[in-house]
Amino acid sequence: MFSQQEVHDIIDRVIGYSKLPGCEVSVQWTEDDFIRFANNGITTSAFRVTQQVSITSTTADKRRGNAVVGEITAEALKNGVKQAEDLAAISHPNPEDMPALPAQSYPSLSNFDGYTASVRGDVMVPQVQAVLAGALKNKLVAAGFIQRSANAVGIGNKAGLFGYHTYTDSSLSHTMRNAEGTSSGWASQSSVSVKDLDGEQQARVSIEKCLRGINRKKLDPGKYTVVLEPAAVADLVGWLGAAFDARDAEQGQSFLSKPSPEAGQGKGAGPTFLGEKLFPEIITLRSDPFHPKLASTPWGQSLLPSEKISWIERGVVRNLYYDRFWAEKAGKKPTPDTANLVLDGQDNSLSDLIASVERGLLVTRFWYIRVVQPKTWQLTGLTRDGVFMIENGKVTDPITNFRWNESPAEVLQRTTKLTQPIRVNTVDSGPDVAPALITTDFNFTSISDAV
């Protein structure tokens, strides 16, 4: 693993080769093991060490070029700088490009597990064996992926900025299908520590869903009360983070914009719902890089120090995301990215939520999520790996999958109950922490034949 001094030396070397006014360097070192399995057997395993240096060069008139190199040699770094500077020379100026950040005070995060960093892939084999044993015992077919990684990252620029961080991560996800391929169950788990992965417990979840999902019934599309499991909630919440962009809100292009003839007309910032209660009191959405379950970094894409920020607090919109350009234009303090999202929960179990629903649907997770209407943050997607009828507080029949159209903001506005949150790896935005929830009038638009 690259030490702090080694990362510093690499950045200094790159900056030393730079001839343009601006040079920003990002260094990534990763050691990882993975095991892939399918058809009830291990198909692939690997141990890899990768290193990458990303170089961004900036001219005096705000032209930028970027190059990425995978070798840490003088020749490779020099060529990377030259490529970045050549690209900058032919790029169009970006009037919104901001001056390089000076030295920052980055927080110290505790998401490095020494055991996970030191072991190899053999420690993950028992978890895979537990999943495969469960599949064989129940005459199902398992496929999945398990991995662990140790990472060192660093950033620096000509203005004196420097940051260094190490973290570990691990995950196990898999699906179970019946031999006929008509039913699918899924389970996933991720953690900073590979010791937390539990293949036997995961297999129980996926097996139960797969066996319960055989002989699915068709249900007419429409609006239903739903219990969304944490994976489904995290997929929605991950998309919602981008909707807190202050520029969109102030220019009338967001669900956080108030109706105004001035918004987006070049007459300054329009009114927003900042400080107003748009959600039930049980809804609190925040960014928390210090959360022990998240493999966060001390900085975001803007390179500003990561910090705890409440976006929604007890139903009230507390903050908007200001990038450096829009913050300067609006006279505001820039804020870090809407990353490391945590949707707080309540002291309920998934069983408690199901028991409180007279008639509705239990949804495992979503996929193929796309934006339909950016202003209202309307999304569309599909359910997968288990949709079940809830009747009189009990899970009954398996149901075919659906296509849905929904705004995650409106889903939270209609939420009535939550469980305790867990870490979930989302389909599109990486790990977040989310609970299961009950929401009403979830809009299913058509039946999907997907399993």
Question: At which residue positions do the language-model features occur?
Answer:
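Acidic low-complexity segments
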Residues: 2-16, 22-34, 78-165, 197-234, ...
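Conserved alpha/beta core surface patches that mediate binding of polyanionic ligands
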Residues: 33-51, 147-172, 315, 368
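Short beta-strand elements
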Residues: 48-60, 163-189, 311-313, 385-392
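Short, acidic (Asp/Glu-rich) active-site segment that either coordinates a divalent metal cofactor
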Residues: 64, 171-197, 275, 317-339
